[in-house]
Amino acid sequence: MPENSLPHSKLGILLERAKAITTPQLMRALTMHKSSGMRMGQYLVTHGYITEEQLARTLAEQLGLPFVDLAMANIEMSYAKMIPKEYALQHEVLPISHSAGKLTTAVADPTDRTVLQDLKTMTGLSVVPVIATTSAIHDAINRVFHGPGSRPD
């Protein structure tokens, strides 16, 4: 690949280096991202090139944030319910624990600073984001607000 055609996507480069995607898949995703506005990672998941978990783990690596498997996490219900269910679903976030005035919150998109600020305002606590998959966040929200075995809204 010529030097001047190197992609400018660190996420894409990380996925390519991990052999999760090929160079042609990366280039196609970059083109679609630019032409459609669709996030590159979402394009790769939607088209079956990578799994949702591969995307979340790579995003966590890229941003230097922890990845959390919400199916295995011990979610503190009182903190999880500090935000409205509708907000949690719409923004794909869920507070999962609290320590020393900090609210650890599972997020699908840790780059959305507005959501992180909203959470701080709603809870009065500093927010520490951890990354989880969108589907795991939705499943956890349903467990928190409806109990185990409940059907999603």
Question: Where are the regions a protein language model picked out?
Answer:
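Short, recurring structural edge motifs at helix starts
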Residues: 1-3, 27-32
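Short, low-order "capping/linker" segments at domain edges
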Residues: 138-153
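Short acidic/polar beta-strand-loop edge motifs in secreted extracellular
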Residues: 29-36, 71
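Polyanionic, low-complexity intrinsically disordered segments
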Residues: 17, 41-125, 143, 147
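Short, solvent-exposed linear patches
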Residues: 5-14, 36-43
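Short hydrophobic alpha-helical runs that function as membrane-insertion/retention elements
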Residues: 126-133
